[in-house]
Amino acid sequence: MNARNGRNQHKKETEDKHMAAILSINAAGQSGKKINKNIYGHFSEHLGRCIYGGVYVGENSDTPNVNGMRTDVVQALKKIGVPVLRWPGGCFADEYHWEDGIGPKETRKRMVNTNWGGVVEDNSFGTHEFMELCRQIGCEPYVNANVGSGTVREMAEWVEYMNSTGDSTVVQKRWANGHKEPFNLKYLGVGNEEAITPEFRERFGLIFAA
């Protein structure tokens, strides 16, 4: 290769690099497969200050809030466009009993969070509070039910509580707690991966069969 050809080759490579650097692609209006927005979903668990002091401070807090939900956190979650939010865990889901988190807050059962630090929780953030959080964010709720220490019946009644339009005893509890209409939950998880024991597999089989 002579010097002239070498200079031309170098010039062409430089131009190619420059062109590649400014290449832009606009797919607007093009047809094709769409990415399911729910892959960008988020996860909330009773761990550290994720729930208490995080998304939830209570109605009587000096921290700005709407119905107990921290205004700044809700605004941040709305800004990033959370499509779906999972709760109550995680590991915590498999020790959470939903009936402890409904009804008047002053009478709710206190519990020890054995998964995360052994802290005592007052269950002031329960099903209704989670649904309120999702309403404020504008996302779909995703509830992960207790299979590790719960029963199939407990899970079934939680779904009934959230979604049934009938007038069963379970649904009447929802009415008494201020929510006449069902929550219309679309996404339900079945336990967490750390609890895959023979008992878990048995319960999962019963749930799947139902």
Positions of predicted regions on the chain:
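Low-complexity, intrinsically disordered or signal/transmembrane-proximal segments
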Residues: Q9-H10
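Non-catalytic accessory regions flanking glycosidase/transglycosidase catalytic cores in CAZymes
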Residues: E13-A210
